[in-house]
Swiss-Prot record:
GO terms for cellular component: extracellular region. Has the structural arrangement of an alpha-helix connected to antiparallel beta-sheets by disulfide bonds (CS-alpha/beta). It is found in: Secreted. This is Beta-toxin Cbo2.
Length: 66
């Protein structure tokens, strides 16, 4: 599974500005989903890869980013 890492409080994606390989996104994806996860910046959001099937990613049901 893969997807955008999401802030549970506001429903927003984690933003990033350096597209492609991105240390911030990799660090955040691994902190949330474990050291086996990968992460990079895609369309100005942190995209996480190699996630377990039940991993919670953006969008959150009933929670819009505002």
């Amino acid at each position: 599974k893969e997807g955008y890492i999401v802030n549970y409080h506001d429903g927003c994606k984690y933003e990033c500005y350096k597209l492609g390989d991105n240390d911030y996104c990799l660090r955040e994806c691994r902190a949330r989903y474990g050291k086996g996860a990968g992460g990079y910046c895609y369309a100005f959001g942190c995209w996480c890869t190699h996630l377990y099937e039940q991993a919670v990613v953006w969008p959150l049901p009933k929670k819009t980013c505002n």
